Amino acid sequence: MNKPLRFNIELGRTKPVNIRDEQVRCPFCDRSKLTDILDTSGHIIWLMNKYPVLEKTWPTVIIETETDEGEFSTLPADEAAHILQFGLDKWRETRQRQEFKSVLFFKNHGYMSGGSIRHPHSQIIGLENYDYHKDITAQNMEGWLLHEDQHVRITLSTHPIIGFFEYNIRFKPDTPVRPVAIRLQQVLRYVLHTLSNLSQSYNYFFYNLEDGYDYIKVVARYVTTPLYVGYKIPQTCDEERAAKITRDIAPYLQATK
């Protein structure tokens, strides 16, 4: 059984927070002051997180755009594919390091996502003593079929991690990245324009579960249900609602770019 990660509260209090208040200076916009850079590709920068609040981890950040603007679903397909490919490469590279039991790769967007910085970015965190595979299984990636083609399979979770609506994108590690990026953009547009139209917040998470596939789980964010907070009980919708979501998301998934 995994032990909880320890969070450094005092260091956390020093982090800049501008996800709600745009008057707070963005630490990612002034690139001349960025340090501990690990790699770059065009305007994308991978660097160490200046605020390593989680003990026994290797926290890094991928700055995806040059400015605070540029939510992933609004980007040109080629730029989205470039960002996704860079992130996948660095995640897979980090997973090869023997000092980590598992490696997280995820993105926050919006004030209810748990993030602190508005500037588009994602995070890769190596965990020295925590193996997320003990908590997450392939069953969490299964569900009602929303779309399937030669590159991806998209489902709505019947066994979500937290609920209510979790969208899973399954693909082979050698799948061309552009169609995966396009499908991710389409799911995010659906989430932002329908389910999450009030909070405008989401997360997406990457998983490798040693079953021959990689997964992206898109989660629309709201206030967390007390059933999960108090009892770890996830919730999902019924068949009728799932059928409606299948119909509603279809127009978003029809486009090929």
Predicted feature residues:
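Conserved, mostly hydrophobic/aromatic
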Residues: H121
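Active-site microenvironments that recognize anionic phosphate/pyrophosphate groups
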Residues: M1-F86, K90, T94-S113, I117, ...
